[in-house]
């Protein structure tokens, strides 16, 4: 499962809550969490870019190229996953791993059980949408093709 346009779909209010949650878990709260949240708000709300002599301001979500973007997105997705997995009460895939906005999983669930899980995930947050691929033979993850042949996993990654 891949998040569709993760950086441009995280509403500020939904992203700042997990950021504050994880900052409050630091062993040493220095600088203070409220100060870091205010700085994050400035980055999110005052980000501008110039293109062909015009200046544009990012009004919502995370601007591409922002230094804090990947970490912010990971915290948001980690919090979202944790919350949705706690709330989902039906059978779920045995394996699911994610790298920022790209996920991969494996399961022995029936096709219908898997679709129930995917539909729950798809509808969990109004701004976050996923694309997905279901296959018994192979999937692509992070530009790598992972295949299941004769009971063994194999992978192929084209040369860079």
Listing of model-derived features with the role each one plays in the protein:
Residues 147, 151-160:
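C-terminal, non-catalytic extensions of nucleic-acid polymerases
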């Amino acid at each position: 499962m891949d998040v569709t346009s993760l950086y441009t779909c995280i509403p500020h209010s939904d992203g700042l809550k997990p950021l504050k949650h994880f900052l409050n878990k630091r062993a040493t709260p220095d600088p203070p969490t409220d100060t870091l949240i205010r700085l994050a708000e400035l980055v999110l709300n005052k980000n501008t870019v110039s293109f062909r002599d015009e200046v544009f301001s990012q009004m919502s979500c995370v601007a591409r190229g922002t230094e804090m973007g990947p970490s912010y997105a990971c915290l948001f997705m980690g919090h979202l996953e944790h919350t949705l997995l706690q709330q989902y009460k039906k059978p779920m895939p045995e394996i699911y791993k994610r790298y920022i906005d790209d996920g991969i999983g494996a399961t022995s669930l029936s096709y219908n059980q898997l679709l129930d899980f995917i539909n729950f995930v798809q509808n969990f947050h109004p701004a976050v949408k996923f694309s997905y691929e279901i296959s018994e033979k192979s999937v692509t993850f992070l530009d790598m093709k992972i295949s299941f042949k004769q009971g063994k996993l194999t992978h192929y990654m084209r040369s860079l």
